[in-house]
């Protein structure tokens, strides 16, 4: 029998984990009692993707937000098979919680586009809303910290998501701003001194921009961006692809460290995907990007300048997804460069023979 090592949580680890937000109506609203737990979990996972929708501007002409969520994505996250995922999606459609709009082939752009997935708002029971209102009033009179409403919490939590570069400090900050009361130690709740101390200690480690003046936030961002190259020195991957000119370019065009970090991650993802694609087609080969440091870094700098020039000169609305445009641009460059080097080495080997 396998023995598991069990550890208790320390006070500093409580907020260090990432969480999905589970909509309460999925469990308490009688209209949706027929949903399975997998159905509810799928709704929650799709709702979480709205964070990426907002950052990528996945908003249709009617200003409705949509997501992209493949069957493989749901299979992996729910740990179920393809048929089960199909049934789950159909259940959500039958209950009026999901709508799928097929995109298909766009003859103008000559591309196949994935289906758009829209989550639909649930039908609330009016009596539930009244009871929630009464409950909130009762809490105010009881001295118990009042929970934010579902809509208030959504507005704060849904904006915390970033790219894969999320870290626990950001998520902790977002949770602290979500309207959820901060839980103190198991002490006398009537002690005003205890409450003041708890708030004071928490605020000292809350780095949300909400805790600073706009001038302070601007100064902080400028400092981090001006030293962007130094912050990357501990990253074993980033210096391999980016020279000083590229780092300075990124720092000039992005106003926040989050934006600069996401730009760098996009370039790295394009490079890694290009390498993986080549290996899947021709098998393992001895070509590594780091072997061609200077050449590749100069190419990235030139491609970045072309990208920013395109962003500046393109007509408003023509490029709907700048992040995706950068990824495709870099991916095409990596693919072509890698193919050219491999072909040159192949020709060199043939000439020796």
From Swiss-Prot:
Database matches in Pfam families: Bac_RepA_C, RepA_N
Region (Disordered), start-end ranges:
132-197
**Presence of the UniProt keyword Protein transport in the record:** no
Keyword field contains Glycoprotein: no
Query: Which keywords has UniProt assigned to this entry?
Result: Plasmid
Q: From start to end residue, where is composition biased (Basic and acidic residues)? A: 157-169
Q: Which InterPro entries match?
A: Bac_RepA_C (IPR041151), RepA_N (IPR010724)
Protein name (database record): 41 kDa protein
- Per the UniProt record, the source organism is Lactobacillus helveticus
